[in-house]
Each structure stands twice: as C-alpha cells, then as structure tokens.
C-alpha cells in the first residue's frame, strides 16, 4: 500500500495556518457549498493577494509534487500561483488564471529542489477595487502517489495523515 500525504498543513482552510496579505486586501473565510474558502477582497488598488507561506519543516522534502486547489474569481480575473524561494530568489513553477465569474480546479506538477527555503501558495485577485479571489481544498502531494480518479489527497487533514482514499480505490461510477 502506498502512503498518500497532503503536505499542505491546512487543506480544508480551518485556520490552523494563518494566511498573510497586504493592507490593500481584506481576508476572510466564508463557507460556500459546504466548503471553507480563503477569500481575498481588494480594498484599494495595489498588491492584491492573500497567501500561505510554508517554511522550515513545513516544506515538503525535495521531489516532484502534484499541486491542486479549487479557485474562484469575481469582478475581475484572478490568478493562483505557487512560488518557491531557493538561494534567496523566487520562481513561479505554477500559475493559472481564473476567469471572472468562474470556479476552476487548478492542477499542476512542481519540483521542489533541495535547499528550498519557502513555498508560497497564493491567490491574487484582479487589481480592481471590489475584486475577489478565493481558494480552497489545497493539496501538495507527491506526484507518484497522486491519483485524480480518487480525488487526489486534498481531504487529508495534515502532513503525516493518510488520505481517506487510502482504504479503498474507488473509481468514477463505482457503487459507494
């Protein structure tokens, strides 16, 4: 049996990890469709993001990972981005634009190198007063254990905790 771990410490947005945001953005945590969300609402034009920063022992070990989240944009397009800091410099290995008025699944593969100093998962709302960007169900799982057919590992509670799907493999259309 392969152990599946979600390395993101608060995948269900339960406030165990606090996001950061500039003063140009209001951050709150609505529940929509029985799902907790991180919402960034633009108050003034400028930096328009809210983000989670993983450092130290919260950074997954070096390797290839599948990153997933659910994202939403309103009043302007938004972006979901993953940043990595290595050697004091930031790179953006994953970025997806979310069209105004849409909810999308963001999926991508990143490679975390040895010596990664910081990993950031960010929602950037459009640079328009009142624009909203939201994200939920954040997943960072080793690419070799990720299985989209069983929902990835996004429901795991914390690093080191098995995903619910580890007990049985269920495919779309199976009797539940």
Report residues per predicted region.
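Extracellular polysaccharide-targeting segments
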Residues: 1-20, 124-176
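Extracellular glycan-recognition surfaces and repeat-rich motifs
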Residues: 11-39
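Extra-cytoplasmic beta-strand recognition segments
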Residues: 13, 38, 42-81, 106-110, ...
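Short, ordered beta-strand-loop transition motifs
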Residues: 28-37, 43-44, 86, 98-100, ...
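Extracellular beta-strand-rich recognition modules
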Residues: 65-69, 118-125
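A cross-taxa feature marking solvent-exposed loop/turn segments within ectodomains of secreted
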Residues: 75-78, 116, 131
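Extracellular carbohydrate recognition and processing domains
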Residues: 89-118, 128
